[in-house]
């Protein structure tokens, strides 16, 4: 087998007359084998180049040295293909191109000797080589077939018997073939030439009759070339059979360029169907043979559409099969044909990738005959099996092939008796065939196979006789049609009679012109149709040809000159020289005659022409050849039709029509828009009138101007400054808007194999991560001094995986580089892959993917504070080396001490680097400047411009407590109140004092010298080599002191720098302020010698560790499923939050049982996470979905009705693509909804006199209505089905329904399956205290926010309401290569906030460690310790922080305005105090107005304890696990409370009892009616968000809760997952019974009250509504619970205890 690619050649022709008339320009250029095409519409665009095996330049004249003649084309292609044919291979040559591109000229050529095409030259060369053979043992035979494919129909051009369309069939052995296609034997080139001429005549006749041209039909010329070699020694004859297929394809054209309409358009569609299928086949074969897919196993998707057209079906072996194939693409050079020429080049470019596996066809007959006989035997056996064996027996000719003539109604015998005797058998045979399944097909196959056998067994002499018989029939048929014959009876070819007048045909195709010649005999020559009553001498057919069309009358006049007169018949359209003839007209030689619409002839009279030449030797000759086009133009001109004018008029009419229709459409669209706007405005007014009551503006009184106090002005200024620099929304908009550029850059990087990854990153200007100047926007320099918070920018992190470097680009730089990347990508398609790979190995400065990278990389930064120089005492610091991401990379030991000017450095041994004394200046002007600024800059970076090098930031006097929090640094959150004393801190206040008395060694104007010694560096990873350190002051980043590099192996002792640097400073106020609060910056660098970057999906596999406030999602939170019944309304923008509630929601899926009840389906809780579970459902059972809402009763939350419950987004993965439109959304039928009472079993978890609200609704769910296979089938093993449910619930006083959304996880089992999980769940509740169905629910914790409607006129609100399109979901070319990578979005902001918090905490830790080290040093050196550093001061500070809400007094002993407690705070303080003191009055009841219900509950708890103070919490019988649950959530807010409570815990509610629908005027809670009436009803915007459970468990175990109204304690299992504590009945309970929101609760602890009440290990939790008393098992356990509930309080308690123990030990 020989595998070779298809040979592809392109050839460009000269301009034709049409192109020259339009002054076309040449757009094709050729150089060697490369062909280039230029886009005339965009000349600046880079020309497209294509490489082929041959590029033939035939655009110029033959005198051009680069001109490719017909001979050259044949030598390159034809000779090679002919040689392959002699070798025994199948050969195919086909030409492709648009109409008029020169295909037929290349394949057929002209009759002139030097103008012959590939086909005649190949045939002539074939017989020349045969005749030149001198080997007597070789014999050759040649057979020819010629067929035409027109409109998917096949016609035989050589056999006149085959008038109809031939069938294309497929044989299992022979493959596709044309049934009954004649194969004629030829013995010389003249025979082939005659057959080609005869075929063209037949093609011309048929085309003329059907008004066709060759450009609309495909011609296939097949040569069967057989070589026989006789071996004299073995007396064996071997054969080689080659099939030479020469194909002239139809023109590829576009309808808009040819103006085709009607039948021509249908014909063009059929042609384009064939050519389109050919293009699909070429593309599919090219893809299969391309590099990436070549070695892969063939897939079912690798389908080659051969059968889509007859052409590709017949050429199947030639395209990618057993053939040597060559393609010649004919090109038009004109710019007006750019699109068609480019399409042809692309076809050819794809075709050169096809590989054909050709084999030498040796001895095909013997093998084929054997296989065919085997098939005949098999088919005969099949007929015997069907009981039809006598068919073959009775229709067998002895000694010959078996023919089934009886099946077609023919008898091999000519006798009538034989025919009559077989009539009965034939009829019975037909009946048997009719009722025998499959027998007709078998007989048809048998017939087909026997016909092939007969053809193969035909001898060469028989083939010659059959060829001659067909030739005689063909010529007889042509003679009947009036076509001129030779004397021997053959048809005339290229021949011109010398005397007789005659007609020659003219055709649009030059190959068909002058192909047919009709004699005009003396007398009358009639022209008409074949079906005329009188025999016609010239037979024509087709449209507009009458039965008797016209008469040619030839009469001889004097002198022997014959005169021919044309007499048209009545009603016949006949034109002479363009004029319609209605009466006899004398013809002159050269006249053009048109009969009907498609038959065009030229009249030739040789004698008459000779006489005219003799009379007028200089007779004028026409300026252009008299051809078909000339006759057509003449006809139009004589008929008064100006084509150019007609086209211009038609074009003008079309433009006018287009203009009218466009104006009409614009008018209708405007009318429709106005109509819709009016309807929307009316609907909006209707909604406004419904939700917004009309307010009488006349009743509004003008408000008096409010007089603000100084403190209120400060608060307003602080709030204004806070929101002015707020960045969360703007950062999100930048991430969303630029995501598409990031995706495109990554896609191009992957396709070009650049090994560079791009990802968004947030950078904040902090001490640990200063921003370089090139990343700051231009406007940043102006507001840098006035910004109260460090700037956060969105940048692009560029990870160069090839060089192991990381760069940061601005978004503008990314867009600029992206333009260069696109240009590189476009150029890469034209550059060979080998060149691209070579370029990848060299990183040049011109590559937009790479930047220059330094040898050393920053390991991290460390900060050393200098406040020990105030006293002065020496300190040795061990500071952490922190990277810009907040990771500790190692530690650095640095010594700082004050020295005298002449003091020498200590001896550290060899290798010490001793430097001289450096002088640093501090300017007081900057200090005064910053003192006058009201808003200091926090955390200034060192990366200012040259004018800011002397910037002094230490004058701010900012200490440990003065810096903003991480939230303020990132501007993502806003604290409730501004930090007081922003410029002051306790440490700085203690260090402030008279500079001239307290700091004697730091007198202003004196010179102070101190020493900084870099000792060692440790714990630095071995991936960093050549470590060195440099340090500088924050304001003098240009003056850095550097150590020498040291080799780092990661093992052994720490790296010893021992670098000593003495620094002399002139003491100024700014210097003193600097050493009080500001550090020295140490930067550690190293050479990075590893490439740490993982693959492109790094962000997906290893996300940053989240903040403790933003936990990673266990399961993605889905957006609500769109409602199907509710009309889309404009969502009002929420304003200030009015109140919040915590909702505990139970979800159940109930299935119909045999007894008719709906029982909750089993839920598998083995996942371990709260609020999660998998529903185990049965297939094909009716179901209902039950949802129960539980919350504390409040006056602002009233449920009216469930508007709609929708389910959708059926999937088998937790994630869902919410951008896609889900067609399977189903709106459920609500069966019931309303408020319910909990069942008695649920009351055991509640306090009966606590107002609680249960709202439940139920809907029928038919899962089959989704039409989803995932819900209808049994779920496969290890697969889960996910579904999203959304409930739209209408609330009173709300503008729109609230939406609760939950993702369900389900597994479907067979209908009768016994679920394995149910057994484990029964074991789970095996104690008997819980019912089996109580665990069959999934819970969800939600936060309901009721907000006021925002003011639409607020500019800030309008900015926050702007909608920015998230471009990360937009498709980018090559996105599928990114393997799931996505640009970072909103989560990046939250992760960056956690990074900033880490950096802030690390900075505070270093500052605190410094102060502790300084205090310890001062104590050991017997120096006076400042008040801020003393233990007593620390204890007071901690007590102040632990009290939380305590109010320190001002200097005058009066509380500041902000510190005055309001009424609510006072009530809360009284409640907590009474809880701890346990001195409540026993008779205290609800009748007291000034005390809330929560105080009453706490009083009852206290009274219970006072009744039995001696009760042991762990030994009493009442402490055993009971069915009663303590009141974890008690009470309601009082009348004076204007804030809405935040419920924190929820009970369970199985099997509730429905209550009657509540009236809208009533409330489900016992709220005073007078209070409700007094409160004005304001419209609110509801928003419900699901709370995702944290995966981090801070503490879990048992706690004892004091039960109300009793002296007993109830034992409950508690799991703390901050910020919530989840309550369970036991450690085996899987359903959350209630939750406690720790973020809104306050934890109280008092040892004195424990001792007085004799209730050890207890602490209280106070919420907005009640207090809860809890007891732990031991003292250690209690402190652990305190740490889990409130880490700060636990730390304070432990600090006090440790100080107390140390004091006791000292005593």
UniProtKB/Swiss-Prot annotation:
Protein name per Swiss-Prot or TrEMBL: Kinesin-like protein KIF1A
Stretch list, region Disordered: 1424-1462, 1536-1576
Reaction equations catalysed: ATP + H2O + a kinesin associated with a microtubule at position (n) = ADP + phosphate a kinesin associated with a microtubule at position (n+1, toward the plus end)
InterPro entries: FHA_dom, FHA_KIF1A, Kinesin-like, Kinesin-like_KIF1-typ, Kinesin_assoc, Kinesin_motor_CS, Kinesin_motor_dom, Kinesin_motor_dom_sf
EC annotation from Swiss-Prot or TrEMBL: 5.6.1.3
Free-text function comment from the UniProt entry: Kinesin motor with a plus-end-directed microtubule motor activity, involved in anterograde axonal transport of synaptic vesicle precursors. Also required for neuronal dense core vesicles (DCVs) transport to the dendritic spines and axons. The interaction calcium-dependent with CALM1 increases vesicle motility and interaction with the scaffolding proteins PPFIA2 and TANC2 recruits DCVs to synaptic sites.
Subunit structure and binding partners: Dimeric motor; dimerization is required for ATP-driven processive motility. Monomer in vitro. Interacts with PPFIA1 and PPFIA4. Interacts with CALM1; the interaction is increased in presence of calcium and increases neuronal dense core vesicles motility. Interacts with PPFIA2 and TANC2; both interactions allow the recruitment of neuronal dense core vesicles to dendritic spines and decrease in presence of calcium. Interacts with SYT4 (unphosphorylated) and SYT11; both interactions increase in presence of calcium. Interacts with MADD.
Domain of life, source organism: Eukaryota
Stretches assigned to coiled coil: 439-466, 637-671, 811-831
GO biological process: anterograde axonal transport; anterograde dendritic transport; anterograde neuronal dense core vesicle transport; anterograde synaptic vesicle transport; dense core granule cytoskeletal transport; interkinetic nuclear migration; protein transport along microtubule; regulation of dendritic spine development
Annotated ranges, domain FHA: 525-581
Binding site residues for ATP: 102-105, 215
Alphabetized CDD domains for the sequence: FHA_KIF1A (cd22726), KISc_KIF1A_KIF1B (cd01365), PH_KIFIA_KIFIB (cd01233)
Region annotated Required for interaction with CALM1, PPFIA2 and TANC2, chain positions: 657-1105
Annotated GO MF terms: ATP binding; ATP hydrolysis activity; identical protein binding; microtubule binding; plus-end-directed microtubule motor activity
Gene that this sequence comes from: Kif1a
Leading EC class: isomerase
Domain notes: Composed of an N-terminal active core containing the motor domain (MD) and a neck coil (NC), a central regulatory center required for dimerization and activation and containing the FHA domain and coiled coils (CC1 and CC2), and a cargo-recognition region containing a coiled coil (CC3), an undefined region (UDR) and the C-terminal PH domain.
Family: Belongs to the TRAFAC class myosin-kinesin ATPase superfamily. Kinesin family. Unc-104 subfamily.
Gene Ontology, cellular component aspect: axon; axon cytoplasm; cytoplasm; dendrite; dendrite cytoplasm; glutamatergic synapse; kinesin complex; microtubule
Major localization class: cytoplasm
Membrane topology: Peripheral membrane protein
Kinesin motor domain span: 5-354
């Amino acid at each position: 087998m020989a595998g070779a690619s298809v040979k592809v050649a392109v050839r460009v022709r000269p301009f034709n007359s049409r192109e020259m008339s339009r002054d076309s320009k040449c757009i094709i250029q050729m150089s060697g084998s490369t062909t280039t095409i230029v886009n005339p519409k965009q000349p600046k665009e880079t020309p497209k180049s294509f490489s082929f095996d041959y590029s033939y330049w035939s655009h110029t004249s033959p005198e051009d040295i680069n001109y490719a003649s017909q001979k050259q084309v044949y030598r390159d292609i034809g000779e090679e293909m002919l040689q392959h044919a002699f070798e025994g291979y199948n050969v195919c040559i086909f030409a492709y191109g648009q109409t008029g591109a020169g295909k037929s000229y290349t394949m057929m050529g002209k009759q002139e000797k030097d103008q012959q095409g590939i086909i005649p030259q190949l045939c002539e060369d074939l017989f020349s080589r045969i005749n030149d053979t001198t080997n007597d043992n070789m014999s050759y035979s040649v057979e020819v077939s010629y067929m035409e494919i027109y409109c998917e129909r096949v016609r035989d051009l050589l056999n006149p018997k085959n008038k109809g369309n031939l069938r294309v069939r497929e044989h299992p052995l022979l493959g596709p073939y044309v049934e009954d296609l004649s194969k004629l034997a030829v013995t010389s080139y003249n025979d082939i030439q005659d057959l080609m001429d005869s075929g063209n005549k037949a093609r011309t006749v048929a085309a003329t009759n059907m008004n066709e041209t060759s450009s609309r039909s495909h011609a296939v010329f097949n040569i069967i070339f057989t070589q026989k070699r006789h071996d004299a020694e073995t007396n064996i004859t071997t054969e080689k059979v080659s099939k030479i297929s020469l194909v002239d394809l139809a023109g590829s054209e576009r309808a808009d360029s040819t103006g085709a309409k009607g039948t021509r358009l249908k014909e063009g569609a059929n042609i384009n169907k064939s050519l389109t299928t050919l293009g699909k086949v070429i593309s599919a074969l090219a893809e299969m043979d391309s590099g990436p897919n070549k070695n892969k196993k063939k897939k079912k998707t690798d389908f080659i559409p051969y059968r889509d057209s007859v052409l590709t079906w017949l050429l199947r072996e030639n395209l990618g099969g057993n053939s040597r194939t060559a393609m010649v693409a004919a090109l038009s050079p004109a710019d007006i044909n750019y699109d068609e020429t480019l399409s042809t080049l692309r076809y050819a470019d794809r075709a050169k990738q096809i590989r054909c596996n050709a084999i030498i066809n040796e001895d095909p007959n013997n093998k084929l005959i054997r296989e065919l006989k085997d098939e005949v035997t098999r088919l005969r056996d099949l007929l015997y099996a069907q009981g039809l064996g006598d068919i073959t027996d009775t229709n067998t000719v002895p000694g010959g092939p078996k023919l089934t003539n009886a099946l077609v109604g023919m008898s091999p015998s000519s006798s009538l008796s034989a025919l009559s005797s077989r009539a009965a058998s034939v009829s019975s045979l037909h009946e048997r065939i009719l009722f025998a399944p499959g027998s007709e097909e078998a007989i048809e196959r048998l017939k087909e196979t026997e016909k092939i056998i007969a053809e193969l067994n035909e001898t060469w002499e028989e083939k010659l006789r059959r060829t001659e018989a067909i030739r005689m029939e063909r010529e007889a048929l042509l003679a009947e049609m009036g076509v001129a014959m030779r004397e021997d009876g053959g048809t005339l070819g290229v021949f011109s009679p010398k005397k007789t007048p005659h007609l020659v045909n003219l055709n649009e195709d030059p190959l068909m012109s002058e192909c047919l010649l009709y004699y005009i005999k003396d007398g009358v020559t009639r022209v008409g149709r074949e079906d005329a009553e009188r025999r016609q001498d010239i037979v024509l057919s087709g449209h507009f040809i009458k039965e008797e069309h016209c008469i040619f009358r030839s009469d001889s006049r004097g002198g022997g000159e014959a005169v021919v007169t044309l007499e048209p018949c009545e009603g016949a359209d006949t034109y002479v020289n363009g004029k319609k003839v209605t009466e006899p007209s004398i013809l002159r030689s050269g006249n053009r005659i048109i009969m009907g619409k498609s038959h065009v002839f030229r009249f030739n009279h040789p004698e008459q022409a000779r006489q005219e030449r003799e009379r007028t030797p200089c007779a004028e000759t026409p300026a252009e050849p008299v051809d078909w086009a000339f006759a057509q133009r003449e006809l139009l001109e004589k008929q008064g039709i100006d084509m150019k004018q007609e086209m211009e008029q038609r074009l003008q009419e079309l433009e006018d029509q287009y203009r009218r229709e466009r104006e009409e459409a614009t008018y209708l669209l405007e009318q429709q828009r106005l109509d819709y706007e009016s309807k929307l405005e009316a609907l909006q007014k209707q909604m406004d009138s419904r939700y917004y009551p009309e307010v009488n503006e006349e009743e509004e009184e003008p408000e008096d101007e409010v007089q603000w106090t100084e403190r209120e002005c400060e608060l307003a200024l602080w709030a204004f400054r806070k929101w002015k620099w707020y960045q969360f929304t703007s950062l999100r908009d930048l991430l969303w808007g630029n995501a598409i550029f990031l995706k495109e850059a990554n896609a191009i990087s992957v396709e070009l194999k650049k090994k560079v990854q791009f990802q968004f990153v947030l950078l904040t200007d902090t001490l640990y991560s200063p921003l370089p100047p090139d990343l700051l926007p231009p406007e940043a320099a102006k507001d840098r001094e006035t910004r109260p918070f460090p700037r956060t920018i969105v940048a692009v992190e560029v990870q160069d995986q090839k060089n192991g470097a990381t760069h940061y680009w601005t978004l503008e730089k990314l867009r600029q580089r992206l333009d260069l990347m696109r240009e590189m990508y476009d150029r890469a398609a034209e550059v060979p892959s080998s060149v691209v790979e070579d370029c990848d190995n060299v990183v040049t400065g011109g590559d937009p993917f790479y930047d220059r990278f330094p040898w050393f990389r920053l390991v991290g930064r460390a900060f050393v504070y200098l406040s020990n120089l105030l006293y002065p005492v020496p300190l040795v610091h061990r500071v952490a080396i922190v990277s810009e991401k907040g990771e500790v990379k190692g530690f650095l030991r640095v010594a700082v001490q004050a020295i005298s000017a002449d003091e020498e450095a200590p001896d550290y041994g060899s290798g010490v680097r001793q430097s001289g004394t450096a002088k640093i200046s501090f300017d007081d002007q900057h200090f005064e400047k910053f003192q006058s600024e009201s808003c200091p800059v926090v955390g200034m970076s060192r990366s200012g411009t040259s004018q800011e090098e002397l910037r002094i930031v230490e004058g701010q006097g900012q200490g440990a407590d003065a810096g903003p929090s991480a939230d303020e640094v990132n501007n993502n959150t806003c604290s409730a109140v501004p930090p007081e004393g922003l410029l002051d801190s306790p440490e700085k206040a203690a260090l402030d004092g008279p500079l001239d008395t307290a700091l004697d060694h730091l007198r202003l104007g004196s010179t102070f010298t101190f020493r900084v010694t870099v000792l060692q560096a440790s714990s630095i990873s071995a991936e960093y080599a050549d470590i060195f350190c440099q340090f500088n002051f924050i304001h003098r980043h240009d003056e850095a002191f550097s150590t020498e590099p040291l080799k780092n192996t990661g093992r052994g002792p720490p790296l010893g720098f021992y670098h000593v640097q003495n620094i002399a400073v002139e003491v100024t106020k700014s210097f003193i302020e600097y050493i009080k609060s500001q550090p020295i910056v140490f930067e550690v660098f190293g050479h990075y010698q590893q490439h740490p970057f993982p693959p492109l999906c790094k962000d997906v596999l290893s996300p940053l560790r989240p903040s403790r406030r933003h936990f990673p999602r266990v399961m993605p939170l889905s957006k609500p499923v769109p409602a199907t019944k509710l009309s889309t309304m404009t969502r009002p923008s929420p304003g200030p939050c009015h109140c919040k509630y915590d909702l505990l929601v139970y979800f159940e899926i109930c299935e119909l049982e045999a007894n008719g009840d709906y029982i909750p389906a089993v839920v598998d809780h083995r996942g371990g996470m709260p609020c999660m579970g998998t529903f185990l459902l049965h297939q094909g059972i009716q179901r209902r979905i039950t949802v129960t809402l539980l919350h504390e009763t409040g006056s602002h939350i009233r449920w009216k009705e469930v508007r709609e419950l929708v389910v959708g987004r059926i999937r088998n993965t937790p994630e869902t693509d919410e951008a896609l439109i889900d067609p399977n959304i189903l709106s459920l039928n609500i069966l019931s909804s309303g408020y319910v009472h909990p069942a008695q079993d649920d009351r055991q978890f509640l306090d009966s006199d606590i107002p609680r609200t249960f709202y439940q609704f139920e809907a029928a769910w038919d899962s089959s209505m989704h039409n989803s296979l995932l819900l209808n089938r049994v779920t496969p093993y290890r697969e889960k089905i996910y579904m999203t449910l959304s409930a739209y619930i209408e609330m009173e006083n709300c503008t729109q329904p609230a939406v609760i959304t939950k993702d369900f996880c389900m597994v479907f089992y067979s209908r009768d399956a016994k679920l394995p999980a149910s057994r484990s769940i029964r074991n789970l509740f095996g104690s008997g205290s819980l019912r089996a169905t109580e665990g069959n629910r999934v819970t969800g914790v939600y936060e309901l926010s009721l907000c006021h409607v925002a003011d639409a006129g607020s500019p800030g609100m309008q900015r926050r309401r702007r909608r920015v399109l998230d471009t990360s979901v937009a498709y980018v070319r090559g996105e599928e290569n990114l393997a799931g990578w996505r640009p970072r979005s909103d989560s990046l902001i939250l992760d960056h906030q956690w990074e900033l918090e880490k950096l802030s905490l690390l900075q505070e830790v270093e500052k605190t460690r410094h102060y502790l080290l300084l205090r310890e040093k001062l104590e050991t050196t017997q120096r006076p310790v400042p008040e801020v550093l003393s233990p007593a001061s620390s204890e007071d500070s901690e007590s102040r922080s632990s009290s939380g809400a305590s109010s320190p007094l001002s200097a005058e002993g009066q509380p500041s305005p902000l510190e005055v407690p309001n009424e609510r705070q006072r009530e809360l303080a009284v409640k907590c105090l009474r809880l701890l003191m346990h001195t409540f009055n026993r008779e205290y009841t609800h009748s007291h107005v000034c005390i809330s219900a929560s105080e009453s509950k706490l009083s009852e708890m206290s009274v219970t304890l006072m009744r039995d103070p001696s009760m042991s919490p762990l030994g009493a019988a009442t402490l055993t696990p009971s069915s009663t649950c303590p009141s974890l959530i008690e009470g309601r807010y009082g009348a004076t409370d204007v804030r809405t409570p935040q419920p924190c815990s929820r009970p369970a509610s199985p099997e509730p009892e429905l209550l009657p629908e509540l009236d809208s005027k009533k409330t489900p809670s016992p709220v005073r009616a007078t209070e409700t009436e007094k409160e004005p009803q304001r419209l609110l915007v509801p928003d419900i968000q699901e709370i995702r459970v944290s995966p981090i468990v801070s503490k879990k175990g048992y706690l004892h809760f004091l039960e109300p109204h009793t002296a007993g304690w109830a034992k409950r299992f508690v799991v703390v997952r901050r910020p919530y504590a989840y309550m369970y009945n036991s450690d085996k309970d899987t359903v959350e019974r209630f939750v406690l929101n720790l973020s809104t609760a306050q934890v109280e602890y008092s040892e004195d009250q424990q001792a007085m009440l004799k209730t050890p290990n207890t602490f209280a939790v106070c919420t907005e509504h009640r207090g809860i008393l809890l007891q732990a098992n031991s003292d250690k356990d209690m402190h652990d619970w305190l740490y889990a509930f409130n880490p700060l309080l636990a730390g304070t308690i432990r600090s006090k205890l440790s100080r107390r123990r140390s004091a006791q030990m000292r005593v």
